[in-house]
Amino acid sequence: MIDINAWLEFFCGRLDENFPGLVWFLGLQGSYARGEAKDSSDIDIVVIFDRLTMNDLQRYREMLDGLPEREKICGFVSGRDELMHWETSDLFQFCRDTLPIRGSLAEVLALVSDEAVKRAVLSGACNVYHACVHNFLHERDADILAGLYKSAAFVIQAEYFMNTGQYVKRHCELAGLVSQEEREILRPDSGLGFDELSGKLFAWAGRRLTE
């Protein structure tokens, strides 16, 4: 598995060489940030520039193309002003799931109200429900389904925060705090087939919308 600390040190060096003094915030998301990474895990990097242009994006892409593990690098890139005007229901998960490396997202998180968290839960459940139905009927893609289970995990995180005021970042820890139904979403049974896994996700998302 990737030595993420060594990789980040190299990444930061290249970022400083290419964009000296231009990065407002740098962070890590996803399984590496949660300490739950596997060999197949992506490297989810968050880079917020003071100001972002298409020329900056071109230069950043060229920088990424010269990095090790290029095929695993993904993440979020934005200008600071654009992020400060983002839909606040999206900012809840974005801020809570990001491990800061340089800078702070406190200014961004302060924009997120209780109502925004409720919207995050509702819109997340709506998106999972619709995509689950579409995938079951048309695509029938196991990778899409796996991605929807990940999306559902974020909804469960947000709902748990909404109910308790506590944000539990590690999914393995959250699984011990929620209902059996939610636990089966956080830890889907690898022995189940596509249809049964789709059915469990469909039922969970439907209940989130109607209860």
Label each region the model flagged:
Residues 1-17, 21, 33-39, 50-211:
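Catalytic core of pol beta-like nucleotidyltransferases
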Residues 21-29:
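Short, glycine- and small/hydrophobic-rich beta-strand elements in well-ordered beta-sheets
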Residues 44:
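N-terminal loops that bind phosphate or other acidic moieties
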